[in-house]
């Protein structure tokens, strides 16, 4: 415990012009969420913050709209003019005055881990100022860390202001620091903009404080991946690749077999049982729970769903906000839409769409069917081409099918309608009324045959010789 009040301050006022986007840089997506959302979540997971605040400028309204649902308690501070990172922090002076420590971070550092931020805050609580650094093989574009003879940080020199010797330094400023209130309030007003950019650099705070004899602790990351930011699309893709590899390692730790670890995308949280096998080009979104022994074949997309043990999801199937039971068989090319529950042993075959339906135990919808707003009992066979006609142009209506029902191919069930236990529906029927239990229902017209029928013949075309 710190026994101190802590403000988490995120600087998100920059335009990010190199992204060539109509959105601010902070809203560029990593792992299905804006970069800034990853950082805010990591800050919260430290369990050390009293409040969070975001300094915004460019397209601030869009930033607030994107984050307000997941981060409703964040304070918003507007930077009226884009005068640099030092000026951005100065904009939050009223909030800084209310907290013992302020944790400051740039919005485009989505891979920082909560444990790293915890360590930085504890160091700042002890020394008054702690700054996060990393060793980079290619430090181009980053501010370089300068140490004094005591080992403390005495300056940060930005790339555009660095001399040749300083540019050879590989230890860089990550863009995360924690500073006690007294020093921020004392030294922020002393920042100057005598640099190549004509801006007030937050990094200049280091030299001002060190010059007065204060020790500034540097905390160097074990993995430089946490320090990665993104100023353009190529760097954004590199961030996504590191994020994906983190998620892959989480799956390995759960005992999942990935046929090709480089060809999976995970945008969310995956909770997997033992002996799960995932083939290439699978996309997992939101919260996905996968039981023991499940196989997910290539090309599938699963979002916010639960898959029971020993189920197989065949190739190119899409499952969205649904629950699949144990030992089920789904696909290939099946689409399972929200509010669908498929019981144990259910079989949903190729080119079948299920929406807001309950499919009973060991029931089968094998081919080329649409089942919407329906409740199907146990051990039902739904023939190829069966459609539940659930929409009348104004409202949706339900279809109820009992246990042990057999529905022939190319059948239309016009809702609202009920097919009771044990009934059989003849192929090609259009069912508009309820069907009693253990009966055969069919609406097939009588077969008509015309003898000696000849199909119309095409007329031969004669070429014009002229």
From Swiss-Prot:
Keywords: Acyltransferase, Cell shape, Cell wall biogenesis/degradation, Cytoplasm, Magnesium, Metal-binding, Multifunctional enzyme, Nucleotidyltransferase, Peptidoglycan synthesis, Repeat, Transferase. Signal peptide: none annotated. Residues 255-466 are annotated as: N-acetyltransferase. One of its GO terms (molecular function) is UDP-N-acetylglucosamine diphosphorylase activity. Gene3D superfamilies: Hexapeptide repeat proteins (2.160.10.10), Spore Coat Polysaccharide Biosynthesis Protein SpsA, Chain A (3.90.550.10). UDP-N-acetyl-alpha-D-glucosamine binds at residues 11-14, 25, 79, 84-85, 143, 158, 173, 231, 337, 355, 370, 381. CDD domains: GT2_GlmU_N_bac (cd02540), LbH_GlmU_C (cd03353). It holds the Pfam family NTP_transf_3. Mg(2+) binds at residues 108, 231. The keyword Transferase applies. Residues 234-254 are annotated as: Linker. Homotrimer. NCBIfam families: glmU. This is Bifunctional protein GlmU.
